[in-house]
Amino acid sequence: MINDHLNINPIAAPIDAEPERAVLIGLITPEQNEAKVAEYLDELEFLADTAGAVTAARFTQKVGGPNARTYVGSGKLEEIRAYIEDNDISMAIFDDDLSSKQVANIERELKVKILDRTSLILDIFAKRARTANAKTQVELAQYQYLLPRLTRMWTHLERQRGGIG
């Protein structure tokens, strides 16, 4: 199954294990005011709880749009990192979809598992799928979600060409 090879089910833990502690992160933008972001984070917290994680804190930042490198600004990322280190947090869940580069950059900075809303929802479906057909459909959805992220991961090799002279 996909979860065995690609660790797509990052919240899954043994039954007796402590639930993972997570922080939720969202952006207040010109398109989304504070009240709307609070509503989205309430929903995200419910999803995290459904997946088996406990929300320890929420972080928001008011910006014009997501940072292409790390979704949030460097100062906010540092604030989140300090909180994670001080409070035994194992996961950060972002309200919006993240690119593969953003996930890699954020993981490097925060040193915890990074999920976005879509990967969290797919995780919930994977945990609850019972029939072989349902499991296959969830696995297909996970692959479809991963495909563009995996494709963009190798763009750093585009200029390297083989050939003579």
What are the language-model segments listed below?
Residues M1-D123:
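N-terminal accessory targeting/assembly segments
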